[in-house]
């Protein structure tokens, strides 16, 4: 919905400072005003100084100005505007005695608003004329599906979260699990998919792709642990492959983190909690800059909630936005991160019940115990990105982005103990601990062009986009000895080079007032070059070099479309269909092969209802969907990564609601159901409910996030406060051999109080101190020792979830701005 900018109603001119000499040339002061929903000026900042005396005079006048507030439809909005004030030299002494200067009539030298608002005309001819630029956030583009969520984190940041990954829980149908430790990427469950650590969900950070091709731990591995939560302003979660801009790995959907720091000044936070957990964060937004300019540093360290769970990591993220002209801005972004962590891995349920683990015999010690202490990992990541945005005539836009990523990761895991090794004759098993390493560089370009076309007097959005990405990585897996941890066998060792070139076209039109159609197509090509460094030194024809080169090519096209019917001004019916794809893992390709890919076909239909666009609003959504994948992947304990199983299908539904009231109460709730099955041979594709249930994917997921903010007077001093609640409900997960896990119910709470620039907070995660299993499996293993006979019976394995965790936090807010009138 278009935004109407504020219009001046009363604008008395500033008074010429008495303590300055007569002017010989004009003096310009550029002010940034915050105009609230009532049209009052609530805050004034100097963007461009004309000297301290002139700054004070301009600010004193601005505080007396009144406006008709900006509006989106009929709802008044709080916005920021840039107002230039000119102090002109007088032509004669008589005029000088008046000691007044009016803002000069001129065009704004600042860029136009991101929402395309034009400078308003003066409300009355006798008022001084000046121009403004609305600096509000542009409205989110219309959703391509009911499951396309543009999520403002806002007040829900009060809910306890360990990392930015947990923000995904704000979207319906999302569950996270981590069996690898504090620093290992989370396993994402979305829309009935076990997306692993990213194989079926595309993850981006302001356009920079985070999925890693041919990763040793799994194709598409995406670690978001390096993202500083305080810097995440928005989250876009597109469930399903319905937007032409969605690329590789967007099988279950796409998640994009959008960064920004609304608050200016310094925010420093230090926390300490259970298990010696320590967290120190520092974020800074220069007062004279926009939310797109910030610096953030985050340090985390702790012993973990059990043996071999210690962790330590540090990260930095910085971004600046430069104005290159009235219509052009340049955004520079950089991030650097390093982490090291331990992992307890999985334990057998029978060993926990019988107290066989090498820990104290009490139930809690056994529950949080481990077998192999040589588990854990380390990770490093460095990102640089440059984005140039130009606004064109008629509301068009041209965006160009270049990025480079340097990445290194190493992990060690043991899922089966002593089962997979084929030792030399007469020797015992050496152990199944698997080391997976990944190191490489990614460079790429991304861009989009919106020409701003108008047909028959109506805007018809058309977007053209492209992506070019090149990965040069070394990926390897080795088996490690149980004693000493030395490698004794190489599982695979590949030097991989992958080039992905893609382009898409999307358009939107409204042939009828109540009907909006969207459509588009995406084309992707992949060129794979693999140097296999783990070939045998001898074959049937004799000795050979233990290396081999493989090259392959892949191509796929993905059409997508949706239709939106406006049943009432607030109620819409949206139906979407689309094809998506997941590229091949280069390690499994043959020379000169036309690289296969996993094709996903998905459809969704549902309703959306929204009331309010200002500080209070209520939004309801609900939909049903069906999805079919030509080649799915399921976790294999023998390799420690996902392996292909053939086609699969999903049938599901979800509902979500978000209620915001006057920046005091913010509640979001969702409930999702999905059934994932593997169809029987020859089964009809039109029966997505038939087939064998896929393991590890929960069928029912529920989530509630809520925050309440207020203020009170304590000892005649105003004190701000907030309380927050997070609740996750996870239904039973099917396991192999017709087994099911237990349901999980978790509650997290937090409370904060702020006096002036100091804030104290406390958070409690898993308030009820539940003993829950974060990941659960059912398979054959042998952890009794290298000489013990292996059992052929599958048994339950699990990784323990965190117990009750309490954390206290001290936060200090510094504005670093000179006090002005």
Q: Can you say where each PLM-predicted feature lies in the sequence?
A:
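Face-selective signature of the C-terminal outer-membrane beta-barrel domain
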Residues: 328-332, 377-537, 566, 618-624
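Transmembrane beta-barrel wall of Gram-negative outer-membrane proteins
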Residues: 272-301, 306-345, 375-397, 456, ...
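Membrane-embedded beta-barrel scaffold of Gram-negative outer-membrane proteins
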Residues: 282, 397-415, 566, 572-578, ...
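Short acidic/polar hinge/loop motifs at secondary-structure boundaries
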Residues: 208-239, 257-258, 358, 637
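C-terminal beta-signal and adjacent terminal beta-strands/loops
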Residues: 667, 729, 753-821
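Gram-negative outer-membrane beta-barrel transporters
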Residues: 449-450, 513, 517, 525-526, ...
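Extracytoplasmic beta-strand/coil segments of soluble accessory domains associated
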Residues: 165-212
